[in-house]
């Protein structure tokens, strides 16, 4: 890649956005940001606490502001929160300010990757995790597809392999 375009990773929880994003940024010598971690830095609290205190709407407002600021930077890799695409403004900014890579994964892989993670507020509910993930997929997958420049399935692949696939696809476009 001659010029350093921003690379924005979207997809459901458990798709590997943060892990793959760090790997990708390292391989491309770019700065890496994770929108959830940025929110935690700015609030001094974890995402679960923000959800509990401010509700999902309050969290999404913070997320939209953070993503707006980060996408104004140049030459970054950004792992977005799974629900960030619910905001039309965020979708528009991601599309306009960089290359959007949709990291796709199955519900089974999401369950396996998130089952012991207590930092997933949307899974800390009474409903069975599979039902929650299926409902989120029905709502969000069309939004990921709407803005994706590239789609890559992450099931059964290491972060390094997926990062290499992304680099190859970006270089061939």
UniProtKB/Swiss-Prot annotation:
Indicate the enzyme's highest-level EC class.
transferase
Q: Name one GO cellular component term.
A: cytosol
Recorded superkingdom: Bacteria
Which GO biological process entries does UniProt record here? amino acid biosynthetic process; aromatic amino acid family biosynthetic process; chorismate biosynthetic process
* Xref: CDD domains: SK (cd00464)
The Enzyme Commission number assigned here is: 2.7.1.71
Pfam families to which the protein is assigned, alphabetical: SKI (PF01202)
Give residues annotated as binding ATP.
14-19, 120, 157
Name of the protein in question: Shikimate kinase 1
Q: Which organism is it from?
A: Citrobacter koseri (strain ATCC BAA-895 / CDC 4225-83 / SGSC4696)
Q: Which gene encodes it?
A: aroK
